[in-house]
Structures are given as structure tokens and as C-alpha cells.
Amino acid sequence: GADCSGFVMSVFANFGYELPRVAAAQYSASQKRDLSQMEVGDLVFYGSGISHVALYIGDGKVVHALNSNKGIVITDYNYDTPVGVGSYME
């Protein structure tokens, strides 16, 4: 199974986007957005050192590789406290 950043990277690769491999680098390279401006396709980042990333799918939900036991899951975006939102979409 993919880890969180690998999952996001492979989803974006399907649409021709090349993202960095790790969550912190994905955040650094993204266009920052305010949480209130979040749009479908944005990335939501978690953890003090940006240790986790999820893909926003609308209606307050994200899809992400939670951990090796749970695999790919859909949860509320605020299942944990988001520390940032980034976009790769034009």
C-alpha cells in the first residue's frame, strides 16, 4: 500500500502533475490557500512538521492513505487539525 504522500503523488501523476515525494515538500511546492478557500483537488496537510497529507474531495471530506492497517480511507478533513492547505490546480 502507498503512504500518504505516495498516494497523493500517484493520483496527481494520473493527471500529468509531477509532485514531490514527501508531504513536507508537497506543501512547500504548493500554492498556499486559506482553509476557508479550500476547493476540490486541494491538498490538506497535517502534523507540526507536515507529516501527513490528504486530498480534499468536497463536502468537508478528504481521501488519504491513513496508515498501513487502514489503507486508503475517506474521513472528515478535520479528523485531525489541518496545518495548511495547498493547491496544484490552475
Residue ranges and their predicted role:
Residues 17, 23-33, 51, 57-90:
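Aromatic- and glycine-rich peptidoglycan recognition patches
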